[in-house]
Amino acid sequence: MGWSNFRDGRCKSNIHEDVPGLACINKLKPVTYKLEVKKLDQFLGRKDSLMNTMQPGYAIAEKKIHTGFVAQDVEKAAFELHYDFDGVNHPQNDKDNYSLVYSQFVPSLVKAVQEQQLLIEELKKENENLRHSVTALQASFEKLKK
């Protein structure tokens, strides 16, 4: 059984369909990066004895390439959209770090797909109308040629 979050509608109020879709997704900057694990441990104030024990693992961990987002970039994108996004965990003090809750990106991704689908449907209609116009123009042209 996978991870689940409490989402029962019977215990929710003040529900609004105001999640930004494409506007939010288009502001995000997917990146690849190497995590500086030792630097993170130092920043978080991990004890030297623990860091010495973990020393052999640092080199391996720091070679791995990760894919994701920079939390501060996500925070900036949400701020620019006036979106109170709950997918960014902000530092609680000067020795805490930013983190992201990737599952909270799903509503914006769903909204973006819905918005794209509406655009696709509009373009299909426009394309069909243009095809009819071209067919009518071709028929008129053929009549003029005779």
Annotate each language-model stretch with its function:
Residues 1-20, 28:
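Small/polar residue-rich beta-strand/coil "junction" motifs that cap repeat-based extracellular fibers
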Residues 18-24, 70, 109, 133:
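Stable alpha-helical elements in mature extracytoplasmic
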